[in-house]
């Protein structure tokens, strides 16, 4: 099933003049979920409801990277929009989205680089509008450039994540550093907006999507004790704790329970 990030990747591929080689590009991947083919998650794609929307502004080659986590966001959050960033040629559809009266855009960026009056730490429903989180999907150096050179974003509040929230999230992840991927930032934003079920499912999706990378070159064993079996069961039980109603309604997860 196509979504905004996959369509943006297709558009970027059409403009490419040579193969894009990056970390993870040698492994054969499912064209839809972008997970290594042996562990395709298409049948397990979450379908949770969320009031929030996501707007991914992606630096030039980000959609081409096999390890880009914008795919996970689009898999979980239905209202995910993705645009390639350009300093000069701004996408008209992006501007129309930012002007859509149903949305209250927030640009997610560290507050120390922004005028104090623009910084907010909470997500408020202004006039009943739904929150739209603008995420700069790029390296840190590229993201700073995007922030400085995008004047059309200057009218929006800058959402800065609180140290307490970052600390709570760090306890749930294996790496102990201050660098978060795009999907992890999105999960924190969803939590702030009250979309806790979507936030939790995205956390699980992100954590487990990284598990299959070191296993990719090993022979695949089938059966209940295979890595695939542990992978899917772990995914199910994690989602069940976060969002039991959705998990029990999903046929794939019910089947996993019966096999467990």
What are these regions (language model features)?
Residues 243, 249-252:
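Cysteine-centered motifs
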Residues 27, 37:
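Residues immediately within or flanking Cys/His clusters that coordinate Zn2+
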Residues 78-148:
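S-adenosyl-L-methionine/SAH cofactor-binding core of RNA-modifying enzymes
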Residues 7-23:
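Short Cys/His-rich Zn2+-coordinating modules
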Residues 254-259:
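Short, intrinsically disordered C-terminal tails of secreted or membrane-associated proteins
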Residues 132, 140-239, 246:
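C-terminal folded domains that constitute the principal catalytic or ligand-binding module
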Residues 30-33:
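Short cysteine-rich clusters marking metal-coordination/redox-active sites
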Residues 41-56:
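Short cysteine/histidine-rich zinc-coordinating motifs and their immediately flanking basic loops
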């Amino acid at each position: 099933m196509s979504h905004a990030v996959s369509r943006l990747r297709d558009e970027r591929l059409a403009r490419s003049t040579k193969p894009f080689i990056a970390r993870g590009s040698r492994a054969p991947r499912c064209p839809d979920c972008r997970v290594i083919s042996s562990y395709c998650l298409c049948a397990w794609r979450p379908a949770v409801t969320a009031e929030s929307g996501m707007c991914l502004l992606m630096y030039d080659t980000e959609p081409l990277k096999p390890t880009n986590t914008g795919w996970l966001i689009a898999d979980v959050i239905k209202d995910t929009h993705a645009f390639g960033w350009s300093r000069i040629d701004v996408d008209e559809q992006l501007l129309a989205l930012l002007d859509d009266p149903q949305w209250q855009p927030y640009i997610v960026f560290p507050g120390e680089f922004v005028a104090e009056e623009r910084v907010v730490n909470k997500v408020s429903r202004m006039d009943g509008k739904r929150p739209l989180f603008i995420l700069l999907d790029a390296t840190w150096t590229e993201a700073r450039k995007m922030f400085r050179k995008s004047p059309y974003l200057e009218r929006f509040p800058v959402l800065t994540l609180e140290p307490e929230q970052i600390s709570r999230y760090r306890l749930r992840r294996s790496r102990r550093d201050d660098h978060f991927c795009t999907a992890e930032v999105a999960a924190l934003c969803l939590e702030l907006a009250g979309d806790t079920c979507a936030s939790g499912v995205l956390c699980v999706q992100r954590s487990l999507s990284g598990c299959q990378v070191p296993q990719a070159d090993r022979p695949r064993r089938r059966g209940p004790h295979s890595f695939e079996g542990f992978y899917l069961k772990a995914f199910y039980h994690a989602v069940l704790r976060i969002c039991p109603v959705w998990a029990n309604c999903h046929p794939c997860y019910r089947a996993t329970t019966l096999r467990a």
